[in-house]
């Protein structure tokens, strides 16, 4: 609450200057909500019968997850902010329930050249039961591609070995990569197979 008076008068004047304070305040708010949800979950675990209170707790958790998803969509493409937000939320929400948010984070981290962070996150999600997820394999291939010429053939090979051709993104990704390499005929062939 101490940050609020310093933030709001200056937001209209200089958003960039107060953004870090605003981000800290938002993370504190998320931590408070997480603590409340942990409290609700412990109440649910202590209750042996499925009564109205427990039903209300489940509804509250679903509502909060929906609110969090909407908020996450509005966050800037900053790997640090996205990661801190995901770390807080993962205290109460299963990784598989936050799959779109984790995938966005990996994409942003890869585009920001945070190779090690992207790889660690891919490994973490694999350990959490998403090892065979085709979206994870696509991001792994994109991560390889982003590492430069020495890794591009590995990226194509990895994509072909781990992602089924029936996946709607398979040919689009290959087409995009061939286009980046100036191989327009191959790019056109791949994209035409996707449509």
Per-range role (PLM):
Residues 1-195:
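Extended alpha-helical assembly domains of large eukaryotic scaffold proteins
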